[in-house]
C-alpha cells in the first residue's frame, strides 16, 4: 500500500495497514510529518475540541498539558504515534507525488514523484487533506499593499505584531483562535467579517499534575 500524506489521516491509515500486515510506503512532500499541525503556527493555534478527545482511539494520551492543546503538543503526539507503531522507516519525506498510472494488466499503480523516484503499489490512498492550499480573497489592491501581509496557514513567526495596526479578514476557525492573541499585542485591531459574530477567548487552562 502507498499512502500520500503523513498528517493525521495518513498516519492513522498507515498504522492500520501495518497492523493488517501490508507492506507500506507513506510519501510526504514536506520535510516532516504532521500535516495541519506542522504547517499551522499562527498565534493561538490549537485543537478546538478537548485535548483528551483529540487522539486516536487506539493510542490515547492521558497527560495533555492543557484543556485545548497547542499545535506543538499535537505534533509531538503524532511523532510519538509514528514511533510507537513503527512507521518511521515507512515514511519518505520530501517526496511530492506528480503522477499516478494504473496498469490494467498487472493491477498495480505506478507512482512518480518530483524527485524522479517511482513506486509500485497495489493500493494507493490519498491522505493529502483539504487545508493545505491557502486562499486569499480577491480584493483590489491586495497585491500592491505595501505593508506586512500574512495568511494564517503560512504565518511568519519572526514578525512582531507589538504596536502594529492590524486587520484580520475573516472569522472562521483559524481567525477565532488568532484574533484574541493578536489583540493582546496589536496597537489596534480591526476584524472584517462577512457574517458578524462575537469572538471570545476559549475557556482554556493548564492541567495540574496529580
Where is each model-derived feature located?
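Rossmann-like dinucleotide-binding core of oxidoreductases
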Residues: 2-8, 12-26, 30-32, 118-119, ...
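Tryptophan-centric aromatic hotspots in well-structured domains and transmembrane helices
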Residues: 8, 37-39, 64, 96-111, ...
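Short polybasic/polar patches that bind polyanions
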Residues: 18, 38, 83
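A short alpha-helix-loop-beta-strand transition element characteristic
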Residues: 39, 88-90, 188-191
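Intrinsically disordered, low-complexity boundary segments flanking structured domains
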Residues: 40-43, 80, 134-141
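Conserved beta-strand scaffold positions in the cores of enzyme catalytic domains, especially
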Residues: 53, 91-92, 147-150
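Feature captures the FAD/FMN-dependent oxidoreductase FAD-binding
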Residues: 66-132
